[in-house]
Amino acid sequence: MNITTLTNSISTSSFSPNNTNGSSTETVNSDIKTTTSSHPVSSLTMLNDTLHNIRTTNQALKKELSQKTLTKTSLEEIALHSSQISMDVNKSAQLLDILSRNEYPINKDARELLHSAPKEAELDGDQMISHRELWAKIANSINDINEQYLKVYEHAVSSYTQMYQDFSAVLSSLAGWISPGGNDGNSVKLQVNSLKKALEELKEKYKDKPLYPANNTVSQEQANKWLTELGGTIGKVSQKNGGYVVSINMTPIDNMLKSLDNLGGNGEVVLDNAKYQAWNAGFSAEDETMKNNLQTLVQKYSNANSIFDNLVKVLSSTISSCTDTDKLFLHF
């Protein structure tokens, strides 16, 4: 089954990548405090393990997002792995913060030498920073790309998936609103009122649903930037509470409603086969637009995870290099 048959497989699924369990975070905080307070050097080991976990989970998430088959199970796995990454990112940031504030236990003579050195040095006019300052910057980088980039896509995919799930329910009901129009088999009877009501309810529910940001509002410039990033046909920039948001573009639903109005009548409408096929082709084209939008978002989310994975790889390498340098420096 590919993305075009998503309607039957995700109608009851719940994609909530930001639904991280609060008690899990508290447990992580407790574990970090207990371990680092009793043995500060272990925070480096914990950080290395956590970054490794992020990469492993992210690789699994990228594999799921690259699949052409999206099922209820795969969507649940995507949500689970997204939440796990968010929790591990939070843990990494805390560990990096601890490393930036606490002294790394080193050789006594080396510590005295370091304390006697200038706090800052100049090399070719560029300011040098300590490893603890570097780790603090790394912590900020991890948080920034997670909060301001990865989670934006998580929320956008979640919101659009929920909308399409509800549209899938309308499609499932459509079969019951179509019946033969006569005994000759040359006409079709369509319950226009029932279909129109379902589409209007869907539009009312999601017309103000934000793809970005998840909460509050942003500037018009920022909203336009993310509309372009997410895909111009997926959303639209609209005003809200004095600011701007990127809302779900409901144009496909609007076009479906217009096509029903063009059939004439608001109750049962009898269409000859040619007219029904023409209407159904237009209706299906709008459905295809929404499917393509969802597929585009999923692909962009996969690309965002690739960028995040590369960042974690670079940060892991940076931390390892710092640690190796410290070991060489203290080996005397």
UniProtKB/Swiss-Prot annotation:
Origin: domain of life: Bacteria
Disulfide pairings: none
Record's function text: Required for bacterial invasion of host cells. Controls IpaB and IpaC secretion, and the efficiency with which they are physically inserted into target cell membranes. These proteins are exported via T3SS to form a pore in the host membrane that allows the translocation of the other effectors into the host cytoplasm. Along with IpaB, is essential for both blocking secretion through the Mxi/Spa translocon in the absence of a secretion-inducing signal, and for controlling the level of secretion in the presence of this signal.
Gene this chain is encoded by: ipaD
Remaining remarks: Deletion of amino acids 1-20 abolishes invasion activity, affects contact-mediated hemolysis activity and IpaD secretion. Deletion of amino acids 41-80 and 81-120 restores invasion activity to a higher level than wild-type and reduces contact-mediated hemolysis activity. Deletion beyond amino acid 120 reduces invasion activity and abolishes contact-mediated hemolysis activity.
Highest classification ranks of the organism: Bacteria, Pseudomonadati, Pseudomonadota, Gammaproteobacteria, Enterobacterales
Subcellular location: Secreted
GO cellular component: extracellular region
Xref: Gene3D superfamilies: IpaD-like
Principal cellular location given in the protein's record: secreted
Name of the protein in its database record: Invasin IpaD
Compositionally biased tracts (Low complexity): 1-25
